[in-house]
Amino acid sequence: GLRTGHPGFTSWVTTAPSTTAAAGHLASAVAFPQRYWFQPGNHLDAMAVRWLIELLGFPASFVGTFTSGGSTANIVGMGAARQHAAEQLGIDAALDGMGAIPEPRVYASSETHHVVTRAMGVLGLGRANLRLVELDDGRRADLRRLQAFIHEDQSAGRTPVAIVGNAGDVNTGIVDPLPEMAAIAREHDIWFHVDGAYGGWGVLDERVEAAFGDRSLYDSFAVDPHKWLAAPVGTGLTICRDGDLLGRAFSIESGAYLRERSRAMPVEDAESPWGVIGGTMDWGVDFSMPTRGLPVWAVLKEIGAEGMRERVRRHNDFARMVAARARAEEELELLSEPQLSIACFRYRPPGWDDEARLEGLNAGILSELRRVGRSLPSSTNVGGRFALRACYINPRNDHEHVKLLVDDVLEIGRRLAAEA
């Protein structure tokens, strides 16, 4: 098999860290960071958060906290949603629990990542209370169905807690209708959380930025620097409009030796390490944690905002190159039009119409690709059809290996089809 950092590896939405990020990770470990009082790590975390908030197009008034990844980043955002819904009913969910909230409901598309389901269980919202919205013809959350769910639940006395939008699902990279979902959330005063763990970086490609809408209308946003930014795995980020609400949702009572409560760092102190007392340890799940902002800071210092924009555009172009080949080759079938950096296609010889037979053929192609070891996509299911899925997120991906993947699929597919 291929290493995750190989230019032909396109299986996952995570990748090996860049050299600079790995060096930053090592420096973070050696520095033995603490999240309390005047720590250089808190300063670097704060700087990196402010840079990412600006880079991703959020207002300066928004706050952020690093997490261990997308799972925890979504839990933090959903925890804020839970606190918001409870406080509208005069309840402190963090203090008194969920028992007094009548039948909480959360709405998300059927392509929502399972980490949202996990958050429902961890936060006591209940996995059974996640309303999965069917997809429209563009494989996005169906807005009419979303509205119908909300009206049905409100009429029955249930409590809408959050609407969750997908900023690029991990199967096909399709972005939900986020501007319209934000408007629906505002109409009903429901928290709008966006899972952009993989695809949130897509806002940096001006060709698709409009699909993400006005980020000032988001209430919380999860994004993973350990994906497109190529930071070390274990680096997530939650961005939120209300730091005080995060504090009420996640604050703890300090031990006697930490009686001076940590405070959230004001925006104006972001360039001064002496303004940092405790950083953001009351804004999330972790208490002790590494300085995750140091590798992020190092990568951004190395490639800059324009370098990151160029990376996202390049990877999106790679997915479009695969799609163009799939449309041009008689033996290939494009199964999902790329919006971001994921291309889903399959080998389909002329005259082959049986889905079970096509699935077996393409599964065989994938196995042979793994054996040959030059290109390694993954597989997924698109509308009931087995697909070869190439996800371009690795900074080492290049044009040569984009072409090589399609060439290998054609060569192997022809051989296996002839043997069938």
Language model: regions and residue ranges:
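Short loop-beta-helix segment that forms the pyridoxal 5′-phosphate
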Residues: L52-A80, R131-E134
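Short beta-strand
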Residues: E333-P338, P377-V382
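N-terminal entrance/gating region of PLP-dependent enzymes' catalytic architecture
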Residues: G1-S61, V276, S367-S375, F386, ...
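Glycine- and acidic
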Residues: S28-Y36, P59-T65, A100-E103, R127-L135, ...
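Conserved PLP-binding catalytic core of the aspartate aminotransferase-like
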Residues: L334-L369
